[in-house]
Curated annotation (Swiss-Prot):
Gene name of the encoded protein: hisH
InterPro entries, per the entry: Class_I_gatase-like, GATASE, Imidazole-glycPsynth_HisH
Catalytic activity: 5-[(5-phospho-1-deoxy-D-ribulos-1-ylimino)methylamino]-1-(5-phospho-beta-D-ribosyl)imidazole-4-carboxamide + L-glutamine = D-erythro-1-(imidazol-4-yl)glycerol 3-phosphate + 5-amino-1-(5-phospho-beta-D-ribosyl)imidazole-4-carboxamide + L-glutamate + H(+); L-glutamine + H2O = L-glutamate + NH4(+)
Organism lineage string: Bacteria, Bacillati, Actinomycetota, Actinomycetes, Micrococcales
Protein name in UniProt: Imidazole glycerol phosphate synthase subunit HisH
UniProt keyword annotations, A-Z: Amino-acid biosynthesis, Cytoplasm, Glutamine amidotransferase, Histidine biosynthesis, Hydrolase, Lyase
Active site: 82, 191, 193
One GO molecular-function entry: imidazoleglycerol-phosphate synthase activity
Subunit-level organization: Heterodimer of HisH and HisF.
Domain Glutamine amidotransferase type-1: residue ranges: 4-216
Organism: Renibacterium salmoninarum (strain ATCC 33209 / DSM 20767 / JCM 11484 / NBRC 15589 / NCIMB 2235)
Record pathway: Amino-acid biosynthesis; L-histidine biosynthesis; L-histidine from 5-phospho-alpha-D-ribose 1-diphosphate: step 5/9
Length: 219
């Protein structure tokens, strides 16, 4: 049985490349913002292009924040891309204005302190040895397009047996978070769908990790 994946359709630019890349990775893909598709797919992909505050507003307009939250609370796989990663943190600061994020992870999205922004092009990453997403592509380069990033990570593991998230880093002016793997909740700052063979392998790693049980109901 093929894993079912919904790419969240909320007006975030051209997502067709993500749909095609996920199909090549072996998923049955639906582009939708309908609750049935978002909640019941084996995996949900949250793309994001543009300003933090704008993306948050667009997600709210289709009730996506609640649906993403339900999936996370239910332990259902989610992969967020680019600004999709950023909105999972506590806040985003753009042009002096702070916008609350979903708060799944601690941290603030801020302008990268680099001479040239946006950070546009290929860059290497430093993935942890136990990374599922980067299995087979730890030494590869990925494609980034962003001006903002999370430059600090301070995750408090409150439960003794809780496994801390696997955090992957890259650098442009300063170190920033390139990816996070937190159980069923994963996110990348780069665009795997635009990252050639390395991105294709990463997406296949994620699709292969899905339960592939069809459209299960979320309680």
């Amino acid at each position: 049985m093929m894993a079912t994946v919904t790419v969240l359709d909320y007006g975030s630019g051209n997502v067709r490349s993500a749909v095609r890349a996920l199909e090549r990775a072996g998923a049955e893909v639906t582009l939708s913002a309908k609750a049935d598709d978002v909640l019941n797919a084996d995996g949900l992909v949250v793309p994001g292009v543009g300003a933090f505050a704008t993306v948050m507003k667009e997600l709210k307009s289709v009730d996506a924040l609640r649906m993403i939250g339900r999936r996370v609370a239910g332990g259902r796989p989610v992969l967020a891309i680019c600004v999709g990663l950023q909105i999972l943190f506590e806040a985003g600061v753009e042009h002096g204005n702070s916008e609350p994020g979903m708060g799944e992870w601690p941290g603030t999205v801020e302008l990268l302190p680099a001479d040239v922004v946006p950070h546009m092009g290929w860059n290497t990453v430093q993935a942890p040895a136990d990374s599922m997403l980067f299995d087979g592509v730890r030494d590869e380069r990925f494609y980034f397009v962003h001006s903002y990033g999370v430059q600090h990570w301070d995750f408090d593991v409150t439960q003794p047996k809780m496994k801390p998230p696997a955090v992957t880093w890259s650098e442009h002016g300063a170190k920033f978070i390139a990816a996070v793997e937190n159980g069923p909740l994963c996110a990348t700052q780069f665009h795997p769908e635009k990252s050639d063979d390395a991105g294709a392998r990463l997406l296949k790693n994620w699709v292969d990790s899905l339960p592939a049980t069809g459209r299960n109901q979320v309680a």
